[in-house]
Design a protein with these regions (language model features):
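C-terminal catalytic "cap/lid" subdomain
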Residues: 1-64, 68-96, 100-369
């Protein structure tokens, strides 16, 4: 079996018993399965939620207000407990774990991004299992430093280390769809997804699982992003951790989001799954064709609308006229300058394009989805 690099994301509800306490027995099973995978010669990185839930076992805090302060206290206390439980479970398999806490802000600067990658590469080199969680103590929506849930963090890390496979372990058996039978409607697992379509998204239940931040839609969207980056991704039942090994052995489990075949350069990976976007550009049909079909840079004459305030060298998202996101790139001018060019062009009656021929986003600093 060819050696693979694997990311396993474990959801809060997978780690909890019905009473809300951590399921130590299940964590032990997970450690055993990961140890088995590693014995096959594969490298494994774990993304684990559950710090707030672990904190509830040790702290008596009034959470009625659901305040940021109470969540941060629980995360601070619970993260120490959570990593201790993991360390004890993996020690039984003679495996060392490392704790890594990250925020969205850690991925913004490419230098930091590369430092994270180098650390993870060295941990894997020395046969250590990195266990990563979002740093809930400093990652707040107010500071725009949070991922929102660990689903997106798992995709970013899988992209960062060049993972072959990404597993989302949840309390569902996979992405479910309704199917009409003689006995009535029933739910069946969607076994394979080739493209993330509106039909696929309609299968997602809109509710968020109790105890967690994300729901099925979050996982499906994250899986869709991962497969577009060339990573085979699975959503499956984490209460039966043997399923990961079953997939590794070629069996069908859960929902498989089939990886697209294209290769992505390191810099483009950072553009796609690292940098923090500061604004949005809406482009016309001609510019869309120039980018997608002719592989050209984006010029000012193709921009119809500028959203947000961004500076030269900031990252911006690109949308077409129908509101479909086309990609992301590094702007070679500030929003104020670009708006002024568009305004001047609208005011001129000569028919001559007065906008700069300098690219707004150079092809080398562009990632298209």
């Amino acid at each position: 079996m060819k050696s693979k690099r694997i990311v396993i994301k474990i959801g809060t509800n997978v780690l909890q018993e019905p009473n809300g306490k951590l399921d130590h027995k299940l964590i032990g099973k997970l450690a055993g399965q990961i140890a088995k995978i590693r014995r096959y010669g594969h490298e494994v990185l774990v993304v684990s939620s559950g710090s707030v839930g672990a904190g509830r076992e040790l702290c008596s805090i009034n959470e009625s207000s659901n305040s940021l302060a109470s969540q941060q206290i629980l995360a601070s206390v619970g993260q120490a407990r959570l990593i201790q439980i993991y360390a004890d479970a993996f020690r039984k398999h003679k495996t060392t774990v490392a704790q890594i806490l990250l925020t969205r802000g850690d991925f913004v600067q490419r230098t930091y991004y590369m430092n994270i990658r180098n650390t993870l590469e060295n941990l894997l080199k020395y046969k250590i299992v990195p266990i990563v969680n979002e740093n809930d103590v400093v990652a707040t929506e107010e500071l725009e430093l949070n991922f929102g849930d660990n689903d997106l963090l798992a995709v970013y890390l899988a992209t960062l280390i060049g993972a072959d496979q990404l597993f989302f372990l949840t309390i569902a058996s996979g992405l479910l769809k309704k199917e009409k039978t003689a006995e009535g409607m029933r739910s069946v697992v969607v076994e394979k997804v080739q493209e993330l379509t509106d039909e696929i998204l309609r299968h997602c239940l809109p509710v968020t699982s109790a105890g967690g931040k994300g729901g099925m839609e979050s996982k499906v969207r994250s899986a869709g992003m991962a497969m577009s980056f060339g990573i085979d991704t699975y959503i499956m039942d984490g209460k039966y951790p043997e399923g990961v090994c079953a997939v590794m052995e070629g069996q069908q489990r859960g929902t498989h989001f089939v990886a697209h075949g294209r290769k992505i350069r390191s810099y483009q990976k950072w553009l796609a799954a690292g940098a923090l976007n500061k604004g949005t550009l809406v482009i016309d049909k001609g510019a869309e064709q120039a980018l997608l079909k002719n592989k050209k840079s984006l010029l000012a004459k193709g921009v119809t609308r500028v959203v947000g305030q961004f500076d030269n060298k900031d990252l911006v998202e690109i949308f077409n006229q129908e509101g479909v996101r086309l990609g992301v790139g590094r702007a070679d001018c500030a929003a104020k300058e670009l708006r002024q060019q568009i305004k001047e062009q609208n005011l001129t009656n000569t028919g001559v394009d007065v906008r700069s021929r300098k690219p707004v986003i150079h092809r080398n600093h562009l990632f298209l989805e």
